[in-house]
Amino acid sequence: MITNKRNIAISILTADCAPILIIEKKQKFVGAIHAGWKGAFKGIVKKTIQLLKKNGCSEKDMIACIGPCIKKNSYEVKNDFFKLFKDKNKKNVNFFTFKKKKIFFDLTKYIKSQFYENGVKKIDIIRKDTFSLENNFFSSRRSKKNKHNDYGRNISAIMIK
């Protein structure tokens, strides 16, 4: 979702997925993206950049912030997940770590690479793990692991003053 309207906040809710906030200062646009692995895999970053460009924005004037989300040391995945990414592009193996017969996915690094591939070089990353920081963030995976029926959501918002 993007907007150039002043004094209207746009926001997204996440619970392990990556919240991404974007600003393009010259054309005065902001964007908010909810990027889980599926959305990232299907190109939500590229689609949002294209939408901003369609509205006169330039990649070189965009600044993105990838907010708190599940980090690679907490994001264990199955082999079929790894294979899905590897089959799409062999370079995707760079977003996985293998430890003690377990596979871990680096969602933040994957999203960052998509910004770079699409010309956005100014990227801030909040290096907070929603899964491991139990007192600070809600986490879908942590709630499921602890057998809770539901979980809270973290909100990320952006606005042009």
Predicted regions and their residues:
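Active-site microenvironment for binding and transforming phosphate-containing groups
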Residues: M1-K161
